[in-house]
From Swiss-Prot:
This is Peptide methionine sulfoxide reductase MsrB. It catalyses: L-methionyl-[protein] + [thioredoxin]-disulfide + H2O = L-methionyl-(R)-S-oxide-[protein] + [thioredoxin]-dithiol. Its EC number is 1.8.4.12. Pfam families: SelR (PF01641). Gene3D superfamilies: Peptide methionine sulfoxide reductase (2.170.150.20). Binds 1 zinc ion per subunit. The zinc ion is important for the structural integrity of the protein. It comes from Herminiimonas arsenicoxydans. NCBIfam families: peptide-methionine (R)-S-oxide reductase MsrB (TIGR00357). GO terms for cellular component: cytoplasm. One of its GO terms (molecular function) is peptide-methionine (R)-S-oxide reductase activity.
Length: 137
């Protein structure tokens, strides 16, 4: 596994915009249908906004209709971790970057095949790295 990224609160505040900071460091949730990647269709890799760890591939992205980017699998399961989230009187499974502990979103058991999972991820927790389409001439 990649070495843990640990920063002070002041360092996180200096490198992230307000929404990125609130989402990743304080588990806030951006409004649905508002994030830059909920309706994004380019080919590439979505990385952690805090530490650049590769998290999700565009090939695993699907339109769940929920207003947040949704993926049926993580790019590398070792790069994300899950924990029980009991906030707001609900029991959900929170998804966190395993390298820097950034809050990413939640995972639900209502996704498509082949996994049946829906990683519902805040755009504010992600950066996108485009990769060339190998099928193009």
């Amino acid at each position: 596994m990649t070495e843990k990224v640990i920063k002070t609160d002041a360092e996180w505040r200096a490198m992230l915009d307000d929404e990125e900071y609130d989402v990743t460091r304080h588990a806030a949730t951006e409004a649905p249908f508002s994030g830059r990647y909920w309706d994004h269709h380019e080919h590439g890799i979505y990385t952690c906004v805090c530490c650049n760890t590769p998290l999700f591939a565009s090939d695993a992205k699907f339109d769940s209709g929920c207003g947040w980017p949704s993926y049926f699998t993580a790019l590398n399961p070792d790069n994300v971790k899950e924990k029980i989230d009991r906030a707001y009187g609900m029991i959900r499974t929170e998804v966190i970057c395993n390298v820097c502990d950034a809050h990413l979103g939640h995972v639900f058991n209502d996704g498509p095949p082949p996994t049946g999972l829906r990683y519902c991820i805040n755009s504010a927790s992600l950066r996108f790295d485009a990769t060339p389409d190998l099928n193009e001439s």
